[in-house]
Amino acid sequence: MQRFTRPLFGQVLIALALGIALGIWAPDFAQHLKPLGDGFLKLIKMLIAPIVFSVVVVGICGAGELKKVGRVGGKAVIYFEVVTTIALALGIALAYAFGPGHGMNVDPKTLDASAMSSYMATAKQVESSGVAEFLLKLIPDTFVSGFMKGDILQVLLVSILFGCALSLLGERTKPLVGLIDQLSHVLFRMMAVVIRLAPLGVLGAVAFTVGKYGAGSLKQLGFLVLLFYAAVAVFVVVVLGGILRLAGFSIFKLIRFLRAELLVVLGTASSDAVLPSVMNKLEKMGIKRSVVGLVIPTGYSFNLDAFSIYLTLAAVFIAQATNTPLALSDLLLILGVALITSKGAHGIPGSAIVILAATLSVIPAIPAIGLVLVLSVDWFIGIARALGNLLGNCVATVVIAAWEKDIDRARANAVLDGKLDIIEEGEAAARGHGIQVPSASTLPHA
C-alpha cells in the first residue's frame, strides 16, 4: 500500500475516489470543498506565464539560427490544421453513424433560453471579431499585460520577440540568458512544490461537482456523453497513436508516462492544471526546450483536438434532437466554421458553450437555442475534452521534435520504457544523496 500511495498518481487516484464518495454521501459538505480545487488551479495558473516566458526565451536562444525557430513554428501550424480537420470530420462521422440525438423530438420553442443568455452574449462578441481583430488581440497593450491577464498567446508573442532579440544581440546577452535559464529552474521547482497539492485540488473539485450536480444530469444525455468519450478514445488510440507510431513511439507508453498529469486533469477538468508539469516532463524526456516552449503553449490555443470533435458532434446532435435536416453544404459549413472558431478558444470563460454558440450562429439551419440540451452535461464532457486536448498537444510536441531531429531518442525510449525515472521526487532524492541522474549519452540505445 505504501508503494502505491507514495507516487503522485496514486495520491490523486485516492483523492478522486474520496471526492466521488463525499459528493454522493455528503453532498452539502462536499460543496464546501470547492475552494480546494479553485485554490490549486490559481496556484498553477500563477506560474504558467513566467514558465512559458522563460522556457521560450531560453529555447530560442539555444536553438541557434532563427530560421530553425520559424521552421518549427511552420511545421506546428501545418500539423495543427491537419489533425484538427481530422478531429472535426470524426465528430460529424460519429454523429451520423450513431445518431445520439435521434428520437428526442425536441421542440426548440419549448426550451428555456434564460440559462444561455450570458453564453450567447459572449458568443456574439466572438462571432463579431474577425481575423484582423483576433490578430490584434494577440498584441498586448504593454510588455506585462499578457502576464497580468494570464493570456498565453500574448505571453508567447512577447517571449518570441524577446528571445529573438536576445539571439540577434549574440554573445553579450549570455549572462542575461543564463539568468533567465536559472529563473526557469526556480519556477519549475516552485511548480514541483505546488503540484504536490494536486490531491487536495482534485478532492475539492470532484467533491464539489458530484455534490452539486450528481450523476442524475447524465441520464437524459448519457448516450451523447458516452459517445463523446468513445470518440476521444478512438481519436487518441487510432489517429494520435498512428501518428506517434510513424514517429517511432507508442501512445500507450506516453499515456503511462503522463499518468499523474492525466489523473489531475481527470479530477479538475482543466488541462491548465498540468501545463507547467507537462512542459517540464517533455523536456526531461529528451525533447529540446525550444520545441517544447513553442509547440505546447501554441497548441493550447490552436490544437484543441478533443474540443474540435465536440464542436461538430454537438452541432449535429442538436440538429438531430430538434429534427433539423442538414444538407451536405450545411455539414461543410459546420466543418469550415468550426475550423476557425476552435482557434483561440482557450482562456474564454465557458469556452466550449461559447464557441459552440458562435459556430451555430453562423449556421442558420441549426437552432442555437438547442445549446440548452448540452449545457447540463458540459462539465462531464469537459473532462474528456481536457484529457484529449492534453494528449493531442503532447503527441504534437513529440512528433514535431522527431521531424526536426530535436529529440534524444535514446533518452526518450529509456523514459517511456520505464528504465529512467524522471519524476520530481525521484530526482530530488537522487540529488540529496549526491547521485547524478544519467545523461542521455550514458543510456543504452534501444
From Swiss-Prot:
Membrane topology field: Multi-pass membrane protein
GO BP, sorted A to Z: L-aspartate transmembrane transport
Transmembrane segments annotated in the record for this chain: 7-26, 46-64, 77-99, 152-171, 192-211, 221-243, 291-313, 318-340, 353-375, 381-403
Family that this chain belongs to: Belongs to the dicarboxylate/amino acid:cation symporter (DAACS) (TC 2.A.23) family.
HAMAP family: C4_dicarb_transport (MF_01300)
Family matches, as NCBIfam families: PRK01663.1, PRK13027.1
Protein name as it appears in the record: C4-dicarboxylate transport protein 2
Provenance organism: Ralstonia nicotianae (strain ATCC BAA-1114 / GMI1000) (Ralstonia solanacearum)
Lineage, top ranks: Bacteria, Pseudomonadati, Pseudomonadota, Betaproteobacteria, Burkholderiales
